[in-house]
Amino acid sequence: MKNVKFYICPHCGNIVEMVNDAGVKPFCCGQKMQELVPGSVDASHEKHVPDVKVSEGAVEVNVGSVNHPMEEVHWIEWVQLVTDKGSYRKWLNPGEAPNVKFLFGEEKPIAVYAYCNLHGLWKNEIN
Protein backbone atom coordinates (compact mmCIF):
# COMPACT_ATOMS: atom_id res chain seq x y z
CA MET A 1 0.00 0.00 0.00
CA LYS A 2 1.14 3.52 -0.71
CA ASN A 3 2.27 5.95 1.96
CA VAL A 4 -0.68 6.66 4.26
CA LYS A 5 -1.38 10.33 5.05
CA PHE A 6 -3.92 11.85 7.40
CA TYR A 7 -4.98 15.51 7.52
CA ILE A 8 -6.79 17.51 10.20
CA CYS A 9 -8.77 20.74 9.93
CA PRO A 10 -7.32 23.28 12.37
CA HIS A 11 -10.73 24.93 12.64
CA CYS A 12 -13.27 22.12 13.19
CA GLY A 13 -11.09 19.04 13.81
CA ASN A 14 -12.30 16.97 10.83
CA ILE A 15 -9.79 14.26 9.93
CA VAL A 16 -9.40 12.76 6.45
CA GLU A 17 -7.22 9.99 5.07
CA MET A 18 -5.66 10.65 1.67
CA VAL A 19 -6.75 7.79 -0.58
CA ASN A 20 -5.16 9.05 -3.80
CA ASP A 21 -2.50 11.73 -3.38
CA ALA A 22 -2.46 13.96 -6.48
CA GLY A 23 -0.26 16.51 -4.71
CA VAL A 24 -2.99 18.90 -3.56
CA LYS A 25 -3.69 19.30 0.15
CA PRO A 26 -7.36 18.93 1.12
CA PHE A 27 -9.38 21.95 2.28
CA CYS A 28 -11.93 22.24 5.08
CA CYS A 29 -13.68 25.29 6.56
CA GLY A 30 -12.13 27.41 3.79
CA GLN A 31 -8.50 26.60 4.62
CA LYS A 32 -5.84 23.97 3.92
CA MET A 33 -5.89 21.01 6.24
CA GLN A 34 -2.70 20.21 8.17
CA GLU A 35 -0.95 16.87 7.72
CA LEU A 36 -0.91 14.75 10.88
CA VAL A 37 2.66 13.59 11.45
CA PRO A 38 2.88 10.53 13.73
CA GLY A 39 4.67 11.13 17.03
CA SER A 40 5.15 14.86 16.44
CA VAL A 41 3.43 15.95 19.67
CA ASP A 42 5.43 16.10 22.89
CA ALA A 43 3.72 13.35 24.87
CA SER A 44 4.45 10.03 26.55
CA HIS A 45 5.60 7.49 23.95
CA GLU A 46 4.95 4.57 26.30
CA LYS A 47 1.23 5.51 26.44
CA HIS A 48 0.72 6.31 22.76
CA VAL A 49 2.85 4.16 20.43
CA PRO A 50 0.84 1.06 19.46
CA ASP A 51 2.27 -2.17 20.91
CA VAL A 52 1.76 -4.78 18.18
CA LYS A 53 1.69 -8.61 18.21
CA VAL A 54 1.41 -10.36 14.85
CA SER A 55 0.23 -13.95 14.48
CA GLU A 56 -1.12 -15.96 11.54
CA GLY A 57 -3.95 -13.86 10.06
CA ALA A 58 -4.26 -11.54 13.06
CA VAL A 59 -2.76 -8.44 14.61
CA GLU A 60 -3.35 -7.60 18.26
CA VAL A 61 -2.78 -3.99 19.27
CA ASN A 62 -2.50 -2.49 22.73
CA VAL A 63 -2.13 1.27 22.61
CA GLY A 64 0.97 1.92 24.64
CA SER A 65 3.32 -0.36 26.52
CA VAL A 66 1.53 1.24 29.49
CA ASN A 67 -2.23 1.39 28.89
CA HIS A 68 -3.39 4.71 27.48
CA PRO A 69 -6.08 6.50 29.54
CA MET A 70 -9.59 6.01 28.17
CA GLU A 71 -11.43 8.87 29.89
CA GLU A 72 -14.14 11.22 28.61
CA VAL A 73 -11.58 14.00 28.13
CA HIS A 74 -8.60 11.90 26.96
CA TRP A 75 -8.81 8.68 24.95
CA ILE A 76 -7.71 6.81 21.84
CA GLU A 77 -10.39 7.51 19.24
CA TRP A 78 -9.34 4.91 16.67
CA VAL A 79 -6.70 2.37 15.70
CA GLN A 80 -5.87 1.54 12.08
CA LEU A 81 -3.98 -1.41 10.62
CA VAL A 82 -2.36 -0.86 7.22
CA THR A 83 -1.50 -3.91 5.09
CA ASP A 84 -0.04 -4.36 1.63
CA LYS A 85 -3.62 -4.62 0.28
CA GLY A 86 -5.50 -1.91 2.21
CA SER A 87 -6.41 -0.90 5.73
CA TYR A 88 -8.74 -1.65 8.62
CA ARG A 89 -9.91 0.82 11.28
CA LYS A 90 -11.58 0.23 14.64
CA TRP A 91 -13.18 2.95 16.76
CA LEU A 92 -12.85 3.07 20.54
CA ASN A 93 -14.91 4.86 23.20
CA PRO A 94 -14.05 6.28 26.61
CA GLY A 95 -14.21 3.53 29.22
CA GLU A 96 -13.15 0.77 26.81
CA ALA A 97 -9.76 -0.91 26.96
CA PRO A 98 -7.21 0.61 24.53
CA ASN A 99 -6.71 -2.63 22.63
CA VAL A 100 -8.10 -4.16 19.45
CA LYS A 101 -7.66 -7.28 17.35
CA PHE A 102 -7.67 -7.26 13.56
CA LEU A 103 -8.34 -10.44 11.59
CA PHE A 104 -7.35 -10.55 7.93
CA GLY A 105 -6.49 -12.96 5.13
CA GLU A 106 -3.16 -13.45 3.41
CA GLU A 107 -2.15 -9.81 3.60
CA LYS A 108 1.13 -8.53 4.96
CA PRO A 109 0.72 -6.09 7.90
CA ILE A 110 2.83 -2.95 7.40
CA ALA A 111 1.96 -0.45 10.15
CA VAL A 112 -0.48 0.40 12.93
CA TYR A 113 -1.71 3.93 13.66
CA ALA A 114 -3.46 5.15 16.82
CA TYR A 115 -5.16 8.54 17.19
CA CYS A 116 -5.34 10.23 20.61
CA ASN A 117 -7.89 13.03 20.89
CA LEU A 118 -5.34 15.21 22.78
CA HIS A 119 -1.94 14.09 21.49
CA GLY A 120 -2.61 13.29 17.85
CA LEU A 121 -1.39 10.50 15.61
CA TRP A 122 1.05 7.73 16.59
CA LYS A 123 2.53 4.92 14.49
CA ASN A 124 4.34 1.62 14.84
CA GLU A 125 5.83 0.05 11.70
CA ILE A 126 5.66 -3.74 11.52
CA ASN A 127 8.78 -5.53 10.29
Please annotate each region the language model reported.
Residues 63-71:
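Short amphipathic, basic-aromatic surface patches that mediate peripheral association
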Residues 108-118:
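Short, aromatic- and glycine-rich surface loops/edge beta-strands on solvent-exposed regions
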Residues 117-125:
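Short acidic/polar inter-strand loop motif in beta-rich domains
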Residues 9-12, 28, 116:
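Short cysteine-rich clusters marking metal-coordination/redox-active sites
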Residues 22-33:
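Cysteine-rich micro-motifs
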Residues 62-63, 98-105:
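Exposed aromatic-hydrophobic patches
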Residues 6, 25, 113:
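Residues immediately within or flanking Cys/His clusters that coordinate Zn2+
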Residues 18-22, 36-39, 124-126:
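Short Cys/His-rich "knuckle" micro-motifs
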